Amino acid sequence: MSGKSLLLKVILLGDGGVGKSSLMNRYVTNKFDSQAFHTIGVEFLNRDLEVDGRFVTLQIWDTAGQERFKSLRTPFYRGADCCLLTFSVDDRQSFENLGNWQKEFIYYADVKDPEHFPFVVLGNKVDKEDRQVTTEEAQTWCMENGDYPYLETSAKDDTNVTVAFEEAVRQVLAVEEQLEHCMLGHTIDLNSGSKAGSSCC
C-alpha cells in the first residue's frame, strides 16, 4: 500500500463471551474458531486498509470482558481513537451492560469530550435464532446515549464485520475533519488582535 498511513487505535469492549475476539480475528485473518477461549487481559492485531481514499493502519485491541480482568484491560484504553461497544443479540444482560462499558471507557481513557468521541455499537451473533434484543431496542439505546452508529454483525457468518471496522475508521476521520475545520475557523487577525471566522466547537 502506497502513501502515508494513519495509525488508528480501536478498542473492542463488552461482556465476556459476546464475540469480540471472533470479530477481530474474522476481520484480520478471515477465520472463525467456534472453540475460541475467553481473552485474558488484552490482545491486539493490525490490519491495513483504505477508506474513502485514506490509507489507515488499524490497531485493534480486544479486551477481556470479565470483571476480574478490569485492572489488566483499563490501562490500554488511553490513546484509543474509537471504541466499539459490543453486545450479543442473544444475551440481554450484555446489552444492558453497554452503559457501564461506555462509562468505564470514558473514565479510564480520560476522554476530554465524551459527547464527540467516536463510539460504534455492534450487536453481534445475529446468526443466532434465540434473539433477546431487537434491532429497534439497540437503535433506541444508540440514539439516547450519543447518537452512535449501530451495526448488527456475525463473526461466524462474516456479516457486516468489514463494514463495522470501516465505519469505525469513518467515525474517527469525521471527528478529525471537524476538528481541523474548527481550527481553520479560529484564525487571528494580527493587525487588530481580533479573531476572525466563526467557531464551530
From Swiss-Prot:
Reaction(s) catalysed by this chain's protein: GTP + H2O = GDP + phosphate + H(+)
Motif range (Switch 1): 31-42
Modulation of this protein's activity: Regulated by guanine nucleotide exchange factors (GEFs) which promote the exchange of bound GDP for free GTP. Regulated by GTPase activating proteins (GAPs) which increase the GTP hydrolysis activity. Inhibited by GDP dissociation inhibitors (GDIs).
Tissues in which the UniProt entry reports expression: Ubiquitous.
Primary subcellular site in the record, as a coarse category: membrane
Binding sites annotated in the UniProt record for Mg(2+): 21, 39, 62
Compartments, as annotated in UniProt: Cell membrane; Cytoplasmic vesicle, Phagosome; Cytoplasmic vesicle, Phagosome membrane
Enzyme class, broadest EC rank: hydrolase
Locus of motif Switch 2: 64-78
Chain residues carrying a lipid of type S-geranylgeranyl cysteine: 200-201
Gene Ontology annotations of biological process type: protein transport; Rab protein signal transduction; receptor-mediated endocytosis; retrograde transport, endosome to Golgi
GO molecular function, one term: GTP binding
Reported cofactor(s): Mg(2+)
Binding site residues for GTP: 18-22, 33-34, 36, 38-39, 65, 124-125, 155-156
UniProt topology in membrane: Lipid-anchor
EC number: 3.6.5.2
Family of this protein: Belongs to the small GTPase superfamily. Rab family.
Job of this protein: The small GTPases Rab are key regulators of intracellular membrane trafficking, from the formation of transport vesicles to their fusion with membranes. Rabs cycle between an inactive GDP-bound form and an active GTP-bound form that is able to recruit to membranes different sets of downstream effectors directly responsible for vesicle formation, movement, tethering and fusion. RAB9B is involved in the transport of proteins between the endosomes and the trans Golgi network.
Domain notes: Switch 1, switch 2 and the interswitch regions are characteristic of Rab GTPases and mediate the interactions with Rab downstream effectors. The switch regions undergo conformational changes upon nucleotide binding which drives interaction with specific sets of effector proteins, with most effectors only binding to GTP-bound Rab.
The name this protein goes by in its record: Ras-related protein Rab-9B
Organismal lineage: Eukaryota, Metazoa, Chordata, Craniata, Vertebrata
Gene coding for it: RAB9B
